Structure formats: structure tokens, C-alpha cells
């Protein structure tokens, strides 16, 4: 693609050098630049891409997009813009032929529920006969091709390249999780969304965003800017959970028609006569398409909201009631989201990604609704992340569990013991009994907590303490198959660990 064609998309305020250049690739990492590349000098928190312009030229970049042209070496073509990230997002879409044009694209954002909602929307669209590609927290997938997801939302060049590849393979629709980081950093500005879905907003990522209002403003961009109708997609929709206070705010600011969902009688999509059990959720959906009876194998009230989000997205896309019902009633299995781990000890073992206070509370409330025995929770908090949520999560675990075992999550470069100490501050505020690990081996008779730094040992202890009828919840890591200690990733999978713990107990004739 010629630089002059990209320049029409980027719309630079100034330019220097020849625009009659053939561009072979787009890059924002100088180490990846190849011959004929266009380099985008992005300013980041820790680095400034302007410092790597010379390195990009030496690796073959023929032009550079900058915010400060004084940093460009003599003889190199440059384009000056106010926002290099926005320019890269638009250029990436054009370079890869605007792959989101002409197909339905659903973007899902919010603190909790994005991944499950993505799976549900995928199922609804697939039931409508649309071959769907999915870009999510867990994986990017289409058909029989699945690749692990390095980020919730990749950088704009990687995103557009991936979507182009998926469309070329036959995808006729795209469902993607859209993170607050991606919205703030303009990674998805080159995508043309048909539907945006807002699930909820609770405390998270405050290590990156200054405060909750900044976090909200990042999420809101999808609805206040990116859903504006244009010639390519004149009919767009904002699907919003208006039971959430931030969602209610967003509904009044959205630039697209709103399809509201929730449990209040005034919303467009809601559920009535709902029952929750170990078998799932049953009830009646009330929609603009009429009432739809349903049963889902998913568990809990928060998953009811995820179901409603998917139903509302189906309504917004103009899909049939049969497709909507068929999608949500299908065998939707979401890795690490209240995922069951089978065992022969009569214990309900659930693995969940809940890593915020709100998510943990939702999961534990769900467990409490279906549990017939005690609730044992094993969890920790990630290092180099928002410290403020640690005591909050500790207090929540202590309040809703019969036994909380606090352990390491991904400590990263922090001391695992120090993180555990901050979590324990929240639990101790409840005045619960503190158990030693050795003491728990013989069981426990009063609501309480313990600290075991090794996650493997914490899981083994929980398996040993649990008895038939109990629910054992392993929270925080979910689908992850690694643990980050220092700067190194080590293989670690909660599902594998708890299964191994029960096998060991069986081999010893225990349980």
C-alpha cells in the first residue's frame, strides 16, 4: 500500500519527504521492523517511541508517524499527527482492507462478565447461522483454529491483521472483548462496531487508571464515540445493563440507540420467574421479540445478567427468538468461569477467574445459593496490581466462606507473604478464628481462615479438609495455566492441581 493512500486515512497536520513510497508493513516496536515498514512512534508510560526512530530506520523503516517531527533524522519521510495511537489504529484498518466492514461486529466491555458474555453471544450468532470469530481473554478462535490470547485486546496492527486473517478463513461475524486499556489507547478505533455491550463497572485496573471516573470514561468511549453511525454502518446499537449505576449513566450518553437490559420492569430485555439451582438457571425472557422460556446450565445471578446481555445483543442484531434461545440453552462451557472439576469424593469443585472484590462476591453468593454443605475458598491477589482491593477481597471471602485459605496468585515482583498480609487485614476485621495449616488437617469446627503461601499446598490442604457436600472454590486464576513469580512464568493450572490433590487422597484411601 502506498504511503500517500495511508496519509489520506491518517490525515497528518504536516509531512516531510516523499509520500510516493510503498509500505510493506506497520510497526510500533522498532525490534520488529522490516524493510519497507512504516514506524509509529508511540509515547508510553515507560518508553517513548521517538527514542527508537533511528533504530527503526536502521531495520528498514522508510517512513515514520510522529507527534514531534524534530526527532526525525534527516532524509527520512515523516507524518506529524496529534495522536500517533489513533493514527496507527486507522492506518491498520486501511492497510488490512477494513476487515470489520460488511460483517456484524460486537464489542463487549465492562469489569466482569465479558468472557462469558462473549461465549454466549458467539453461541447465539452461531445458532443464527453466522460463522463467528472470537477475540477474548482466553483465546482468539474461529472454527478449528484457536490461539492463546496474549492480551484481552491486541495492539491495533495485530488486531486488524488477526481479523483480516479470520475473515479470509471464512468468518462472517466478530465478537470481541474490549478492555479499558484498549479503549484508552485507541486500539479499536479502526474497528467498525455494529453493537457495543456494557456489562457493569466495579473497582479494577486502578493501578492503570487514576480513579473510577477515569476508568468509566475509558469504557464509555465505545458508546459515546465508536458507535456513531456512518455510511458503512448506519444502524448501530448500544446494549447496556442499566441496573448498574454506571450503565444507567452511559445509557443517556450513548450515540447509538440503546437496548437496555436488567431485572427492573422498565428495561427492554429482562427475565421473570427465575429459579437458580445446581442444574442451572430457568425462567422467562421478556424481549421486544416476545417472551422466551429458557434454561441455561450456567450458574448464578451474575450469569443471568450475562445471559440477558447476550439476548439483548441478539435483539440488537435482529436475530430470531429461536436463534437466541438456542444459543443460550446450548452447552456453553467457559474455561475458568465457575468451571467444574470432577472428583469421586462428593465435593463440588469450582474454578473461577474472580479476581476483583465484586466478582468474588458474585461468585460466592452464587455458591451460597446452591451449596448444601460448607464453602471453602482458596484465593489470593496478583502482585504489581491494585493494592486497594486486597483487604476488600479478604473481607468478602471471610464473610461468605466457612473457611478461607489465603494463598499466592501471581505475585510477580512483589513479596507473596506481604500480599497475603494485606489480604488478611480484611479478613481479620471480621473477628474470625485463625487456623494454622497443621491444625486444619484434622478439620475445622468454626468459621475461620488460614494462610498458606504455596498455592499448590493451599489447594492440597483444602482438598484434604473438604468433605462430601462441601463446595470448594478456587478463585482468581480461572483458565490461566501459569503462575508468575518474579518475572518468570511457571506452569500452574488450578484444575490440574485440585484433580491431582484428590487423586492423591484416593490413592491414600482418604476422603
From Swiss-Prot:
Motif Meso-diaminopimelate recognition motif: where in chain: 409-412
Cell compartment(s), UniProt: Cytoplasm
Keywords, alphabetical: ATP-binding, Cell cycle, Cell division, Cell shape, Cell wall biogenesis/degradation, Cytoplasm, Ligase, Magnesium, Nucleotide-binding, Peptidoglycan synthesis
Annotated signal sequence range: none
PTM sites of type N6-carboxylysine: 219
SUPFAM superfamilies noted in UniProt: MurD-like peptide ligases, catalytic domain, MurD-like peptide ligases, peptide-binding domain, MurE/MurF N-terminal domain
Gene3D superfamilies: Mur ligase, C-terminal domain, Mur-like, catalytic domain, MurE/MurF, N-terminal domain
Binding-site residues, ATP: 110-116
Modification after translation (UniProt): Carboxylation is probably crucial for Mg(2+) binding and, consequently, for the gamma-phosphate positioning of ATP.
Single Gene Ontology BP annotation: cell wall organization
GO CC list: cytoplasm
Annotated catalysed reactions: UDP-N-acetyl-alpha-D-muramoyl-L-alanyl-D-glutamate + meso-2,6-diaminopimelate + ATP = UDP-N-acetyl-alpha-D-muramoyl-L-alanyl-gamma-D-glutamyl-meso-2,6-diaminopimelate + ADP + phosphate + H(+)
Name of this protein: UDP-N-acetylmuramoyl-L-alanyl-D-glutamate--2,6-diaminopimelate ligase
Organism of provenance: Geobacter metallireducens (strain ATCC 53774 / DSM 7210 / GS-15)
Taxonomic lineage of the native organism: Bacteria, Pseudomonadati, Thermodesulfobacteriota, Desulfuromonadia, Geobacterales
Amino acid at each position: 500500500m502506498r504511503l500517500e493512500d495511508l496519509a489520506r486515512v491518517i490525515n497528518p497536520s504536516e509531512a516531510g519527504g516523499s509520500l510516493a513510497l510503498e509500505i510493506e508493513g506497520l510497526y510500533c516496536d522498532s525490534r520488529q521492523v522490516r524493510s519497507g515498514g512504516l514506524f509509529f512512534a508511540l509515547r508510553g508510560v515507560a518508553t517513548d517511541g521517538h527514542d527508537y526512530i533511528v533504530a527503526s530506520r536502521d531495520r528498514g523503516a522508510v517512513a515514520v508517524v510522529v507527534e514531534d517531527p524534530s526527532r526525525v533524522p534527516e532524509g527520512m519521510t515523516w507524518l506529524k499527527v496529534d495522536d500517533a495511537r489513533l493514527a496507527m489504529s486507522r492506518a491498520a484498518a486501511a492497510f488490512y482492507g477494513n476487515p470489520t466492514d460488511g460483517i456484524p461486529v460486537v464489542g463487549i466491555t465492562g469489569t466482569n462478565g465479558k468472557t462469558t458474555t462473549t461465549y454466549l453471544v458467539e453461541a447465539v450468532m452461531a445458532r443464527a447461522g453466522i460463522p463467528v470469530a472470537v477475540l477474548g481473554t482466553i483465546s482468539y478462535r474461529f472454527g478449528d483454529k484457536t490461539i492463546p490470547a496474549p492480551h484481552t485486546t491486541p495492539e491495533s496492527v495485530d488486531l486488524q491483521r488477526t481479523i483480516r486473517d479470520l475473515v479470509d478463513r471464512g468468518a462472517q461475524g466478530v465478537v470481541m472483548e474490549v478492555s479499558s486499556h484498549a479503549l484508552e489507547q485507541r486500539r479499536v478505533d479502526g474497528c467498525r462496531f455494529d453493537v457495543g455491550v456494557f456489562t457493569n463497572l466495579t473497582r479494577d485496573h486502578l493501578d492503570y487508571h487514576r480513579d473510577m471516573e477515569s476508568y468509566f470514561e475509558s469504557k464509555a468511549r465505545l458508546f459515546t464515540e465508536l458507535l456513531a453511525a456512518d455510511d458503512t454502518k448506519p444502524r448501530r446499537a448500544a446494549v447496556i445493563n442499566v441496573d448498574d449505576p454506571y450503565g444507567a449513566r452511559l445509557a443517556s450518553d450513548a450515540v447509538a440507540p440503546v437496548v437496555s437490559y436488567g431485572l427492573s420492569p422498565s428495561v427492554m430485555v429482562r427475565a421473570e420467574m427465575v429459579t437458580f439451582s445446581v442444574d442451572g438457571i430457568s425462567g422467562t425472557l421478556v424481549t421486544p421479540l416476545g417472551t422466551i422460556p429458557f434454561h441455561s446450565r450456567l450458574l448464578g445471578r451474575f450469569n443471568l445478567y450475562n445471559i440477558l446481555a447476550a439476548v439483548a445483543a441478539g435483539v440488537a442484531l435482529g436475530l430470531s427468538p429461536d436463534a437466541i434461545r438456542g444459543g443460550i440453552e446450548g452447552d456453553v462451557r467457559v474455561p475458568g468461569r465457575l468451571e467444574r472439576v470432577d472428583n469421586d469424593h462428593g465435593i463440588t469443585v469450582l474454578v473461577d477467574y474472580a479476581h476483583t472484590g465484586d466478582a468474588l462476591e458474585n461468585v460466592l453468593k452464587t455458591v451460597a445459593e446452591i451449596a448444601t454443605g460448607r464453602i471453602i475458598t482458596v484465593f489470593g491477589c496478583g502482585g504489581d496490581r491494585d493494592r486497594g482491593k486486597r483487604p476488600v477481597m479478604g473481607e468478602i471471602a471471610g464473610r461468605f466462606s466457612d473457611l478461607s485459605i489465603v494463598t499466592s496468585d501471581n505475585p510477580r515482583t512483589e513479596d507473596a507473604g506481604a500480599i497475603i498480609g494485606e489480604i488478611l487485614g480484611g479478613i481479620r476485621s471480621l473477628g474470625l478464628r485463625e487456623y494454622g495449616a497443621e491444625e486444619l488437617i484434622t478439620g475445622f469446627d468454626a468459621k475461620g481462615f488460614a494462610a498458606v503461601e504455596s498455592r499448590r499446598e493451599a489447594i492440597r490442604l483444602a482438598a484434604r479438609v473438604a468433605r462430601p457436600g462441601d463446595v470448594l472454590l478456587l478463585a482468581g486464576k480461572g483458565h490461566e495455566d501459569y503462575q508468575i513469580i518474579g518475572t518468570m512464568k511457571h506452569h500452574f493450572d488450578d484444575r490440574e492441581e485440585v484433580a491431582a490433590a484428590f487423586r492423591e487422597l484416593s490413592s491414600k484411601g482418604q476422603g
